Design a protein with these regions (language model features):
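A general alpha-helix detector
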Residues: 58-62, 78, 160-164
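Internal glycine-rich alpha/beta core junctions
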Residues: 1-23, 55
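Catalytic-loop motifs flanking and including active-site residues across diverse enzymes
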Residues: 51-58, 125, 157
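Structural helix-adjacent loops and short alpha-helical linkers that scaffold large soluble proteins
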Residues: 6-15, 67-74, 156, 173
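Catalytic alpha/beta core of large soluble enzyme barrels
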Residues: 23-34, 118-269
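Internal maturation/activation junctions in enzymes
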Residues: 17-43, 47, 51, 63-123, ...
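A ubiquitous short alpha-helical element
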Residues: 6-11, 42-48, 146-147
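Extended, hydrophobic alpha-helical segments in both membrane/secreted and soluble proteins
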Residues: 55-58, 90-94, 241
Length: 269
């Protein structure tokens, strides 16, 4: 589900349609793999569990679109509201499918069609295809970056930042050059207010603990795991890194994915 467009689909049956579609894809997989020896295990699992994994992208884009800082109470409100809705509507759709097509073996008597309905994937390619929206639940790594595509390398600008700079009359080559020299950051731009700078913080400028806290908040609505990356400064002591992992575990986060950083030499440049 594209959270950047949440306000456009929140009052529709989009989540229900997505679950219906995923369940139909699973049925096609079961049908087409009948008699395939090498996929017997996968087919049997699909038949017994009918596990789905509806995910999201565009989380950070929604926040920036609405000028909400990632590290804010408003962000946590949206986080809870969006994922609670997706969970409730996913479960409702699975119940409807069970009434129509029946329950799989492992869910007999539970009134559900699918053992799981949600999983948060990385979506790097999908987010690029869908208008350069932010990947999954992850913040943008930069407000100005080079995208390597099949036909060459192209510079990409944060569209919501570009709109803001245009309103302030500073959407020009020199401004973007300074953003590039500051590794995609806008914290040096004196024309922006503190609130605006907070909205356009990059991944490395957002507290890893805030990433973990919001992941823990939404985990209660997600029956599977989240593709959750952390951006940790190379200068952070090992004990502090360890503390982040322990806190994630204590807060109920099921998994952590990449621990991103940069070399000390690059950070000193």
């Amino acid at each position: 589900m594209n959270l950047e467009l949440y306000d456009e689909w929140k009052d529709t049956n989009a989540v229900k349609l997505a679950i219906y579609f995923l369940d139909a894809v699973l049925s096609e997989f079961i049908e087409k793999t009948e008699g395939n020896y090498y996929l017997t295990g996968a087919r049997n699992f699909a038949m017994r569990h009918r596990a789905l994994g509806l995910g999201v992208l565009g989380y950070h884009s929604y926040l920036q679109k609405n000028m909400i800082p990632f590290e804010s109470f408003e962000a946590t409100q949206f986080n809870a509201r969006a994922f609670r809705q997706i969970k409730e509507q996913s479960l409702q759709a699975s119940q409807e499918l069970a009434n129509i097509y029946g329950e799989p073996e492992i869910l007999k008597g539970y009134g559900m069609r699918n053992t799981t309905t949600m999983a948060i994937a990385p979506t790097t390619s999908s987010s690029a295809i869908l208008g350069q929206t932010s990947p999954g639940i992850e913040p943008f790594a930069s407000n100005y970056y080079k995208a390597g595509l099949a036909k060459g390398n192209f510079m990409r600008k944060n569209k919501y930042l570009a709109k803001l700079l245009q309103e302030k009359g500073i959407d020009n080559e020199e401004t973007w050059r300074t953003i590039m020299l500051n590794h995609g950051s806008v914290q040096h731009l004196t024309e922006l207010t503190d609130e605006e700078k907070a909205v356009f913080k990059t991944f490395r400028e957002i507290s890893p603990m805030e990433i973990i806290s919001q992941a823990a908040q939404r985990q209660q609505y997600i029956d599977q795991a989240q593709s959750l990356n952390l951006q940790i400064p190379s200068t952070m002591p090992v004990k502090d890194v360890n503390y982040l992992y322990i806190e994630a575990w204590k807060k109920g986060v099921k998994t952590l994915y990449y621990q991103r950083s940069s070399s000390v030499s690059k950070e000193l440049m």
